[in-house]
């Protein structure tokens, strides 16, 4: 019986449960990017994630440095064609 309690105590002491299958995907840049060790060929690395991996964004993503929408030639309406 003591062995059972010892086993349960060790099992509960484990920080992360063991999960089979896919690993949890760590998102970055407001869920626009994915943290990876190396970016895919259609992605661009931008800054770093908490785990010191690159934050990979799709090549078409635009990042606003000022934090607000600017009315410039790079605005969303002027960048993409309108769909009928």
UniProtKB/Swiss-Prot annotation:
Any one GO BP annotation for this protein: defense response to Gram-positive bacterium
Subcellular locations according to the entry: Secreted
UniProt keyword Signal, yes or no: yes
Protein name from the UniProt record: Beta-defensin 119
A GO term from the CC aspect: extracellular region
Lineage: Eukaryota, Metazoa, Chordata, Craniata, Vertebrata
InterPro entries: Defensin_big_dom
This protein's record includes keyword Membrane: no
Pfam families: Defensin_big
Disulfide bonds: 28-55, 35-49, 39-56
Function recorded in the entry: Has antibacterial activity.
Keywords: Antibiotic, Antimicrobial, Defensin, Disulfide bond, Secreted, Signal
Gene: DEFB119
Signal peptide span: 1-21
Family: Belongs to the beta-defensin family.
